């Protein structure tokens, strides 16, 4: 009886053992067929137990990491001449390969991770060399993207608003073409560890319908390499050049057309009567002051540069024409009043000449009496053989031809007034013709010659 119970217990234990083993094998089979959870996979891929160290670059002590970059421009604007910078909002995308992040355990070909995972992986130390100010975007969440592919490729995208320096050459302003650059450089890794390069296709993309208030962003993009050499080593650098052509519509309406009308307004004084001194002087001074204000306004939004700009030449010539119109009336007024000065000069000359003439005649008469009476010669002794007196002969030989009759004051006044009117008539044609010639040279030089030089550069 005892042996039978022992045998039955043994059989029962054997059955339980095999059933447990079978259940464990079934559970193991189920667990093998079930995919790993994302949390477990990430812990295994880059957690503390994975051995991944974000402080060490991929291929440590090996070949440099090649980082492919591209940018997508969301907005481009706020180009300031005074501070010589521009503002741009972009998506910056960087791609590189990290063999430590390659996987086969997870079924998906790529993983889109939360931005908080960025602190767990290695990232390039990219910075913008010509950056003056920048900020990230966090509304409604951090505008960052992290994607890891099965082969270890990493895509890191971030949205940034940048204020970048843009040195400008304003000699042709406002008909200029500016070139603004964006430089992407490594801060700490030399070219032995890290190399930046532009993406082969679509390195620089622009949002559809992107427009600028005063410029046209040209479609061709100039992509270059700008390797930097410092005391600490040779660092990788890439740059994109944006060519911006300024539109003249605003400046035509605000500067060129008003100044042109002011110059034309100053020519009205040539048709106003020269006797209307208050009208002509008031018009001349008003146009000069208005032109001065217009010229100052054109320089208010520009930096204080040492060279001459195209707008400076235009404003200076317009001011010169307006001021010359005012001086023209001064010349006309001076010429029209010259007859009064001439009459005053004649009166002074006649006043000084009359006493001298009387004195000369008295001396001449006194000398005659002395000569003839001293030698006892009377008037009869001065008769010649032909009956002509000596004195009469002398007078006939020394008399000058009679002077031309002088013009009357009224005739002189009319003569000088005609001369003044002639100056006005010449100015009516000369000023517009001179301004037209200046315009021809000005627009040909700045719209054709200078622009071709810029394109050739």
UniProtKB/Swiss-Prot annotation:
Tissue-specificity statement: Detected on spinal cord neurons (at protein level). Detected in spinal cord.
Q: How is its activity regulated?
A: Channel opening is triggered by extracellular glycine. Channel characteristics depend on the subunit composition; heteropentameric channels are activated by lower glycine levels and display faster desensitization.
The Gene Ontology biological process terms listed for this entry are: acrosome reaction; adult walking behavior; cellular response to amino acid stimulus; cellular response to ethanol; cellular response to zinc ion; chloride transmembrane transport; chloride transport; inhibitory postsynaptic potential
Q: Where does Zn(2+) bind?
A: 220, 222, 243
Recorded GO CC terms: chloride channel complex; dendrite; external side of plasma membrane; glycinergic synapse; inhibitory synapse; intracellular membrane-bounded organelle; neuron projection; neuronal cell body
Instruction: Detail which positions bind glycine 1.
Output: 93, 157
GO MF terms listed in the record are: extracellularly glycine-gated chloride channel activity; glycine binding; ligand-gated monoatomic ion channel activity involved in regulation of presynaptic membrane potential; taurine binding; transmembrane signaling receptor activity; transmitter-gated monoatomic ion channel activity involved in regulation of postsynaptic membrane potential; zinc ion binding
**Do the record's keywords include Transferase?**
no
Which positions carry the signal peptide feature in this UniProt record?
Answer: 1-28
User: Per its UniProt record, what SUPFAM superfamilies does this chain match?
Assistant: Neurotransmitter-gated ion-channel transmembrane pore, Nicotinic receptor ligand binding domain-like
Q: Which Pfam families match?
A: Neur_chan_LBD, Neur_chan_memb
Which residue ranges run through the membrane? 251-272, 278-298, 310-330, 426-446
Would you list which residues are glycosylated? 66
> Residue ranges, Cytoplasmic compartment?
273-277, 331-425
Record note on quaternary structure? Interacts with GLRB to form heteropentameric channels; this is probably the predominant form in vivo. Heteropentamer composed of four GLRA1 subunits and one GLRB subunit. Heteropentamer composed of two GLRA1 and three GLRB. Heteropentamer composed of three GLRA1 and two GLRB. Homopentamer (in vitro). Both homopentamers and heteropentamers form functional ion channels, but their characteristics are subtly different.
Q: What is this protein called?
A: Glycine receptor subunit alpha-1
* Gene name of the encoded protein: GLRA1
